[in-house]
A protein has these predicted regions:
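Short glycine/threonine-rich loop-to-helix capping motif typified by GTGT followed
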Residues: 196, 271-279, 313-325, 354-368, ...
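Gly/Pro-rich turn-and-neighbor structural signature
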Residues: 33-66, 71-80, 197, 237, ...
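Catalytic or ion-coupling anion/metal-binding cores of large enzyme and transporter domains
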Residues: 296-304, 332-337, 341-346, 412, ...
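Secondary-structure transition/capping motifs at alpha-helix termini
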Residues: 129-135, 177-183, 203-215, 248-258, ...
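Mobile "lid/hinge" segments at catalytic clefts and subdomain interfaces of large enzymes
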Residues: 220-225, 231-234, 239-297, 369-447, ...
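Acidic/polar, glycine-rich intrinsically disordered N-terminal extensions of enzymes
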Residues: 1-169, 174-179, 204-209, 448, ...
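Hydrophobic faces of well-ordered beta-strands that scaffold small-molecule active sites
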Residues: 106-112, 135-137, 161, 183-189, ...
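Active-site cavity-forming subdomains of large catalytic enzyme subunits
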Residues: 132, 154-294, 319-333, 364-372
Length: 583
């Protein structure tokens, strides 16, 4: 009676369940017996009357799925609590920060990039006016590949799929009227990433900014170019030197800046599974860390500013598990393999983008829903920043309206769904924890396989990553063609005779002429004799692996050197890379 009275006074508290009633309180044998009895009675009888739609279920990466997950499954039991952990604590499964979105929402970082610097500046200000909380810049193919806008290889491509940048003047126009100490800027650039970083520094110094107050990211991940995106200039060894030099320079001079953004996104877009995306990205990370350590820099001095970039694909729970698992894997790699001491060095921070390759031309309005679910997976997986794709990106770069709707998608998730109120709300789910554990195990298996080949560079040179991605892409294409992998509007619920009516982003045919005119003006105004001397010094520095290439590059861009000037000078020293075909 006394116990009953005590419970009665505890108004609002649920009564404690007996261990016999609570599954978690059962012994393993009792739970196994309960599950077996359910399968043999209710389940078996029901399936005879209503068979399941598939004989077996798998994730998009091919991981087998149970019908139901219980406390019996690995990772769902109490002995996995150490690996699940708490947010902001090792191994960071539940998030890199103690308060996550309760303290600060993810950065809403919609991409912008087309035409000239002035054109993209206008789009960035439009996005800021509509609630964008970070900036992200895409560059055109000539800028990416190191060609000036008047080069023969640039014809027809200037400003078409990103902003055209030839000289420092273009970057000054790009960020005109934007305080770079008040907003973080991400620049999606790889083979010429060190030059764009030098230009960014030059813009900041020209405005009198303290470099340690700049926050932002340069993608600068050349390894995934060799395996996935296929945009490179130089062979792997000098290319790794460029990444190393930017990381070292950033660590010593820009305490809040991420000088590399190690990217799984492009690996996925090339056809890799989510498991491969996560594992291959970790292999690349290991290679970069080893490269910087070889330069004599202590890992805890640069690791806190390593950043990551992942995709949010269509398989919702697999994506959430991927994000959670890769945080844990990274923490263990940094602690156990590299011996880091700082928690910040073990903490994986990532930008996320919804999956462009899932966007379709047929029934393109459905892309809004695809993107929304992918964005929700990114948020539930704990992303630090997010770009949501425009519904029209299967046709062209997005219009202002498409970008506004994509941004509103994030804002609805942030402000209307209340999902940001609880940290890692799917944590503790038997299914999510089991899938997270399985992802972790398989990621480490792939890392071990690459280690056995001699590391990431050796695996690239052997074409191993490339073949793995190609095989996965082919498998997905077959499954989509057969209908095994449904795509609404493409192989399911197809509307015959549909003619998409969509207003695409227009390309201004005068962009190329305007950009070339601006380039020629810089060439006319600069001190070409001084420039020639600086380019000679660049070659000397490039030939001496002990020197950092960033200071001379900063001098060059301040002197009016174009990207093409710098790239062509280094071709004379390092040559160009030719990929061995993968059979």
């Amino acid at each position: 009676m006394a116990q009953e009275k005590s419970q009665g006074k505890s108004k609002g508290k649920p009564k404690e369940k007996s261990k016999k009633d609570a599954i978690a309180g059962m012994t393993r044998e009792q739970l196994e017996e309960k599950l077996r009895a359910w399968e043999e009675s209710e389940l078996a009888d029901f399936i005879t009357r209503q068979p399941e739609s598939q004989s077996e279920y798998k994730t998009a990466s091919g991981l087998p799925l149970n019908r139901i997950y219980t406390a019996l499954d690995k990772g769902a039991r109490g002995d996995g609590a150490a690996d699940i952990g708490l947010p902001g604590q090792y191994p960071f499964t539940r998030g890199p920060y103690p308060t996550m979105y309760r303290g600060r929402l993810w950065t809403m970082r919609q991409l912008a990039g087309y035409g000239t610097g002035a054109d993209t500046n206008e789009r960035m200000k439009y996005l800021l006016a509509h609630g964008n909380t970070g900036l992200s810049v895409d560059f055109d193919m000539p800028t990416l590949m190191g060609y000036d806008s008047d080069h023969a290889m640039s014809r027809g491509e200037v400003g078409r799929e990103g902003v055209a940048v030839d000289t420092l003047a273009d970057l000054e126009a790009l960020f005109d009227g934007i305080d770079l100490t008040e907003i973080s800027v991400s620049m999606t650039i790889n083979p010429t990433g060190w030059i764009l970083m030098a230009m960014y520094i030059a813009v900041a110094e020209g405005r009198g900014y303290d470099l340690n107050k700049l926050s932002g990211t340069i993608q600068n991940d050349i390894l995934k170019e060799y395996t996935a995106q296929k945009e490179w200039i130089y062979p792997p060894k000098p290319s790794m030197r460029l990444v190393r030099d930017t990381i070292v320079y950033g660590a010593r001079n820009m305490k809040r800046y991420n000088a590399v953004n190690i990217s799984g996104y492009h690996i996925s877009e090339a056809g890799a599974t989510s498991l491969q995306e996560a594992a291959f990205t970790m292999c690349n990370a290991i290679a970069y860390v080893e490269e910087v350590i070889k330069a004599g820099v202590a890992v805890d001095d640069f690791a806190p500013r390593l950043s990551y970039y992942f995709i949010a694909q269509a398989d919702f729970f697999e994506e959430v598990a991927k994000f959670r698992a890769v945080r844990r894997v990274y923490a263990k790699i940094m602690k156990e393999r590299f011996g880091v001491k700082k928690p910040e060095s073990m903490r994986l921070r990532f930008h996320c983008q919804t999956a462009a390759a899932t966007l379709t031309k047929p029934q393109h309005q459905v892309n809004l829903m695809r993107t929304a679910y992918q964005a929700l997976a990114a948020v539930l997986g704990g992303a630090q920043s997010l770009h949501t794709n425009g519904l029209d990106e299967a046709f062209a770069i997005p219009t202002e309206e498409a970008m506004r709707l994509a941004l509103r998608t994030q804002q609805v998730i942030a402000d209307e769904t209340n999902v940001a109120a609880v940290i890692d709300p799917l944590g503790g789910s038997y299914y999510v924890e089991a899938l997270t554990d399985e992802f972790e195990k398989r990621i480490f298996d792939i890392i071990e396989q690459v280690d056995d080949m001699g590391g990431t560079i050796k695996a690239i040179e052997q074409g191993w990553f490339q073949k793995e991605i190609a095989d996965s892409a082919y498998d997905y294409a077959l499954r989509k063609a057969s209908g095994e992998r449904p795509v609404i509007g493409v192989n399911k619920y197809v509307e015959e005779g549909e003619t998409p009516e969509v207003e695409t982003h227009p390309y201004d045919p005068e962009t190329e002429a305007r950009q070339i005119a601006a380039l020629n003006k810089v060439r006319d105004d600069r001190d070409n004799q001084k420039l020639s001397g600086l380019l000679d010094r660049l070659k000397t520095v490039a030939g001496d692996d002990s020197q950092n290439i960033m200071p001379i590059t900063i001098e060059l861009v301040k002197a009016g050197a174009s990207i093409g000037d710098i790239v062509e000078s280094l071709r004379e020293i390092w040559g160009t890379y030719r990929e061995t075909p993968v059979i």
